[in-house]
From Swiss-Prot:
UniProt domain comment: The RxLR-dEER motif acts to carry the protein into the host cell cytoplasm through binding to cell surface phosphatidylinositol-3-phosphate.
Organism of derivation: Phytophthora infestans (strain T30-4) (Potato late blight agent)
Induction: Expression is induced during host plant infection.
GO cellular component, one term: membrane
Known role: Effector that is involved in host plant infection. Contributes to virulence during the early infection stage, by inhibiting plant defense responses induced by both PAMP-triggered immunity (PTI) and effector-triggered immunity (ETI).
Keyword Disulfide bond in record: no
Name this protein carries in UniProt: RxLR effector protein PexRD21
Protein family according to the UniProt entry: Belongs to the RxLR effector family.
Renumbered ranges of motif RxLR-dEER: 48-66
Signal peptide: 1-21
UniProt keywords, alphabetically: Host cell membrane, Host membrane, Membrane, Secreted, Signal, Virulence
Localization of this protein: Secreted; Host cell membrane
Superkingdom: Eukaryota
Keyword Metal-binding: no
């Protein structure tokens, strides 16, 4: 019986939230039709509205990704050596112990 009450409350709250979330469409549409589209939204120059990507920055990011993978694999190899052999492999002046 408690489960049925819980389900009823959850459904009622969900429906209430859905009703409150929908805006009054008639007023918004009338205002938009009267004023027209905003000039900042409309592309008046005919050009593309995408951001340009600098080639050097993109290349630098790719190089950083490659370097981080190499560093990670190197650290992983050092950890596995330490884990299986028990040797005192040093990483940046510290031991794994």
């Amino acid at each position: 019986m408690r489960l049925s009450y819980i389900l009823v409350v959850v459904i009622a709250v969900t429906l209430q939230a859905c009703v409150c979330a929908t805006p009054v469409i008639k007023e918004a549409n009338q205002a938009m039709l009267a004023n027209g589209p905003l000039p900042s939204i409309v592309n008046t120059e005919g050009g593309r509205l995408l951001r340009g990507v600098k080639k050097r920055t993109a290349e630098r990011e790719v190089q950083e990704e490659r370097m981080s993978g190499a560093k990670l694999s190197e650290k992983g190899k050092q950890f596995l050596k330490w884990f299986f052999r028990g040797s005192d492999t040093r990483v940046k002046g510290r031991s794994w112990r």
